Amino acid sequence: RGGNNSLYLADVKFTSVFLEGTKGFDAILPEAAECRLAGFFDKPELTSNTKLLYVHGAADDYTLPKPCEDYVKKIKSAPGQVEIDMKEGWYHGFHYGQKPKKYKAMTVSKCPAFFVDNEGYVVGDEWPELVLNKYKLYSSIDEFYDTAQIEPKKAWKTSFKMLKKEKCLDRGVTIGGNHMDEYMPQFINFFKENLL
């Protein structure tokens, strides 16, 4: 479940830890992921046998569509292996069966992006600068990585407090939609075409 999990499982660097070779799921359909702060690989590569359809509401103000469109476009893959469908006027939760309405949910779209290299180390200087120098949360980058691996919940809570101090968190999103009947044929047909 979830767009983030689907995108993790689509990457050969992730699946190769559990499976031999470059193959993974035959079909993956991520929806409305949070692509800037999820810790995705900076140089994503799709598993060799996977067909991926990425769907996102173009009006989504909770998990922004543009960063995900950009991320999915840079996934290394064979021609025709990846398709992106941005749904005009659709919000987050476009298939919830309820009229879109405002919620005070928190967003992170103004916070520094967090991507990792093939070894799992953060890409760029922004996060190390924040956690080591500006807020002095860790004495070294190794301590930061160790905490993230050994105590991920603690590392996230510490980072979240830092993001609050950075004033990059925001509140107020639109969630909902009655697009299930419109979307379901595309959803079902994608899996029929790629699994049967």
What kind of feature is each model-predicted range?
Residues E20-G89:
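The feature captures the conserved acid-bearing segment of alpha/beta-hydrolase catalytic domains
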Residues N5, C35, D60, H92, ...:
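Short, flexible micro-motifs
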Residues F14, D70-K73, Y103:
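Glycine-rich, phosphate-binding/catalytic loops in enzymes
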Residues A10-F14, K76-S77, K192-L196:
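Sec-exported extracytoplasmic/periplasmic mature domains
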Residues Q81-L196:
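C-terminal catalytic histidine-bearing segment of alpha/beta-hydrolase fold enzymes
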Residues R1-G2, A32:
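Catalytic nucleophile serine of serine hydrolases
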Residues G3-F18:
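Short glycine-enriched nucleophile-adjacent loop
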